[in-house]
Design a protein with these regions (language model features):
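Glycine-rich phosphate-binding loop used to anchor ATP phosphates in small-molecule kinases
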Residues: 1-27
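Conserved nucleotide-binding/hydrolysis micro-motifs of P-loop NTPases
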Residues: 4-5, 30-35, 92-94
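Charged, alpha-helix-enriched surfaces in structured cytosolic catalytic cores
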Residues: 8, 12, 31, 35, ...
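A contiguous binding-surface segment within folded domains or other stable secondary-structure elements
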Residues: 18, 25-45
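Conserved GTP-binding G-domain of TRAFAC-class P-loop NTPases and closely related GTPase folds
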Residues: 38-179
Length: 180
């Protein structure tokens, strides 16, 4: 398991694995950035409810990672170092398995990148079509983190992050609104 964002060291590791007879399968979860950012806060809230110490993920880290892996996967594929590339989207809910949307060699998509971009765009459209649901989820995460936060600094950082996420989402909604 790897995040594929370390460049040459990832490529060298893949080369060593292939040289030793291993198959390399790359599985990508295509997730819209707004969904991904909120999911981190929802995971944090769930960990707090379970009495566990959460780990946060900053907006900066998310932005760096969001498309950072694509170039590396493309390079691994070009070098013949990956046997399978699969693109999934999340299941309908936490109890549903991820749904396969692309598999190298047999798919409606030209390549994994077009699958990732198209599926992310579909998710964005769905979020923008039902903004109240998304904003409600932000509110639920905020309430849980406010009530169960383990320390003042982490709680403040998370609440600031949620406020920024909500603001970013509202700006996106405003961009999407047709001018009158």
């Amino acid at each position: 398991e790897n995040t594929l964002d370390k460049g040459e060291s990832d490529i060298e590791l893949a080369r060593k694995l292939k040289d030793n007879g291993y198959r390399i399968s790359i599985n990508i979860m295509a997730t819209d950035l707004f969904e991904s950012r909120l999911s981190c806060f929802e995971r944090e809230a769930a960990m707090l409810l379970a009495g566990l110490t959460p780990r946060g993920c900053s907006k900066e880290t998310q932005l760096r990672m969001y498309n950072g892996f694509m170039k590396e996967i493309e390079q691994l594929d070009t070098l013949g170092l990956c046997d399978d590339i699969n693109v999934f989207v999340r299941g309908e809910n936490i109890n549903r398995p991820p749904v396969l949307k692309y598999s190298k060699g047999s798919s409606e998509y030209l390549n994994f990148k077009s699958a990732v971009v198209t599926e992310r765009n579909r998710q964005r459209e769905a979020l923008l079509n039902e903004p109240d649901k998304y904003l409600l989820r932000i509110g639920k995460a905020r309430d849980i983190i406010s009530e169960y936060g383990v320390n003042e600094t982490l709680t403040r950082n998370s609440l600031t992050g949620l406020k920024e996420l909500q603001s970013d989402f509202i700006q996106e909604l405003d961009k999407d609104e047709p001018e009158q």
